[in-house]
């Protein structure tokens, strides 16, 4: 295994250098405590740093110093972005996102804080997090909210992972004033998300995968020009972040003596169960990255390393399934790609890429599960990437760990930046936690694969981490048994913690390295031909037909009789042991279209649940960015019944399309009236008042769409999809 995975195996004696696929990096220790790092494209001098490791590998020690240097380089007193304040500096004693990204983004700074910044630079990290809190512009809407940055279809609620902010904030609650800000933001943000993106039928929160936010890179190609599906879908990573936020809300509510603590706990318990059940795909022994919408909640054959790692760390998965999912996550030459399988037609970015911050989360998850092979491979992948690039880059091509591979239209990574903040934090985390086992709470629980002993210890009996006046010493084990080295006896000698490592048995099953890395191409949408009192849907060879959330046994065609309900169908192709992403969906059944822009009168012809959407245009911004997704409240008023209310979303569109679907329950024969009320989108936050990259910034709140009709029809059951 070591020969396949290891830095140690590639150069067990010359621990000052690393060679990978014909490229070499080398480090030299200097007398002043600094280092010189040389890599294929250059050389840099790294000065002495506040923290220092003493191992058998000058390269390991130098890369830790480089991460500290790059964290210092990411410290700024002002930030800027062309889309805000006309690109002029905005005062903020915080961190910029990277050399090419001199601004603060909610997702980036939050993951970076959770990995390392909160423990190393707490006050500056609080400043960065505070920058992403905002009241509403109108001065009347109560509460403080976490800002969802510009994004797919006009931002929130298409993207709904802003709750990652609370993952970072939970490590900074020792400051009472900040803790109160966190509590205030939790209440408002969670209430808003519960109203706008929680689906009570499915039990999950809707919205885009966290971090994987470039539509066709990881979602089907057909989402490139229509992000409604993304807004309606359910993502593993985003739901785990909502779960963690709910647990924090429960904790803070109890501290405040707030009766809502029990409600937050109930919500979290139910969400944990829904995550564990709905995302688990038994045939692949894996948790999928996302599901289809509530009308068709199929599991898409895509897994993502961040989602799996966050789920492991949050303990939302049953232990054995967690082990199986992480152990079974595929490996390629450069490490663990952030998604699996890959798309042969997409350029390199999230597709076909290793992202260091995600590798750091996988390392953290592997430690939690005592997965020695995964701990080793993630540490080594992180070392290779930063050493061969001479910086903690944003991302790398997954096989070569190159910062750019030329392949015509599929070249990439399409975007890349040196000293990317979350990559820097990921590397720091890998050393502090991954090697020395030092937790943010001061605990020392090393879990070091024995395969790394030659690299780190060489002929030494100890390796050392100096952190200010504190010293952490790991003593080499005397016995050779056990694949995972953990803490035995621990001695405290003044400011020095001495840990005697002992061997523990661990599963040494290496991750799979599949030869086939590309998914089959996505099929076209199913085609239905009218036949008698129903439809015949032909099933092309090599594809599986899904209906209302589950696969059908039919192999050549399906004859679907009219039953008075809406049915949703899609196709997926299977080849070489892999399944494609799903085709665009086909909806069959009695769908009534009622013209109108704000109010509609309608009489239900049958009782039960109905699905409703709006036909609209939203030309307020491009499909890939902005803050002006139209968010409205659709009310249903039926004679003798309580008013029902749901949030409907109309993302930026390319021409005319349908909004997100919502569900209402009606009684047959009742006359009902639908009407729209205004909602809340990100342009309503004061945070975006200086946004000049599109509408909804300096021109004021923009929450509009051109609605032409309402579509309504009886819903089919999706229970078989659970």
Tell me what each language-model feature is.
Residues 6-102, 176-179, 187-195, 251-260, ...:
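Acidic/polar, glycine-enriched structural segments that form the non-catalytic walls/loops
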Residues 20, 54-103, 127-155, 198-233, ...:
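Extended glycan-interaction surfaces of carbohydrate-active proteins
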Residues 59-67, 121-134, 177-196, 241, ...:
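Extended, well-ordered alpha-helical scaffold segments
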Residues 102-209, 235-243, 353-380, 406-437:
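Aromatic-rich carbohydrate-recognition surfaces in CAZymes
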Residues 365-368, 373-534:
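Non-catalytic C-terminal accessory modules of carbohydrate-active enzymes
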Residues 532, 538-544, 607, 618-620:
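Short proline/glycine-enriched turn/loop motifs at strand-loop junctions of beta-rich domains
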